[in-house]
Structure formats: C-alpha cells, structure tokens
Amino acid sequence: MRLPGCAAVGRGQTTASGYLGGMPLRLLVGSRPKLIATGLGLRPVAEHRVMPVGGRDLDPPEVAYLAGTRIGRTEVTGLDAAAVPAGPLYVHLDLDVIDSADVPGLRYPAPGGPGCADVAEALRMLLATGRVAAVGIACTWHPGHSAAARTGPYLEGTLATGS
C-alpha cells in the first residue's frame, strides 16, 4: 500500500520533475531491474499486490502506464478493507498525499488531497487488518517548515495505538 500525492510510476526519461522519489512503484514491479533490484537480489512485486492510494499528481505518461497494468488505485476516502491486497502489507505514507494546505512547506506539494484526519483514518483501517508488517513515512519539506506541528499528532496517535 502506498499513500502518495503522486503515482510514483514515472520513468527517468518521462518524469516532469526527474525526482527519483516519483519512480519507486514502477521500479518495485520490475521496471529497469538493473538500476537497483538486480544488484540487491530483489524480485519484482506482482502488480496486483500494489495499490497507490490517493495519488493525484500524475504526468500523462504515468496515466497511460497505469491504464495498462494490474496496479489497483483508490482514493484515501474510498479505501476499504475488502479492496486491500491479501497477505502481509508494507504501508508507505508519503505526506504529500495530504492536501498541501494542511502540510505547508512540502518540496513537491500536491493540492486537492485529503486532510490529515482522513489519512489517519485510512491508516487506522489498514492497521486494523492485523496484516501490516511495516510502515514507512516519507516527507520532503523545505527547511523551516511548520507542518510537523499539524501532522505529528495525527500520526503519533494513529501509530502509537496501532489502530
């Protein structure tokens, strides 16, 4: 499960930003294995096991790529336990999934997203499945940001209780 502001399926040749953080899902499902996976001995994850949640800042090539895959997509507020892939889950939360008005100071803001409370509720639902093996949180803030004071309580409360 990945909760990003962007789809994270860009390619170095087609991404508008050129930012490597916008490419991990595509690499995860087997694109360009020599770049990272082969050297580390990693195998691709099956497309049907990958689900970006809330990704909305997509380049046209990303839209076209996703249309031709088995990668599932949903919105944060539309996420339900029945749609979650079976088996153990790695949940990656990129704070740019949260509306940029709620998380000022992001280097790669994605306006129009869900609020902190909606994202915290989605995390609680995922944790309640009992199948979350690990959670990663990523955020690229400009120095001197003030968003931690807003988002911190939602994340701390959600992750501390595990539900």
Could you describe each region identified by the protein language model?
Residues 21-24, 46, 62:
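Internal, well-ordered alpha-helical segments in soluble enzyme and binding-protein domains
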Residues 63-163:
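Catalytic cores of soluble, metal-dependent hydrolases
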Residues 1-4, 53, 91-95:
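Active-site flanking residues adjacent to catalytic metal/cofactor-binding acidic residues
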Residues 5-7, 57, 95-99:
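Short, glycine/acidic-enriched loop or turn micro-motifs at the edges of active sites
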Residues 1-36, 129-130:
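Active-site histidine-anchored catalytic micro-motif
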Residues 31, 37-50, 55-60:
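Phosphate/diphosphate-binding glycine-rich loops and adjacent basic-rich segments that engage nucleotide
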Residues 17-18, 41-45, 83:
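Solvent-exposed alpha-helices and their adjacent loops that cap or buttress functional pockets
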Residues 11-15, 36-40, 60-67, 102-103:
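A short secondary-structure junction signal
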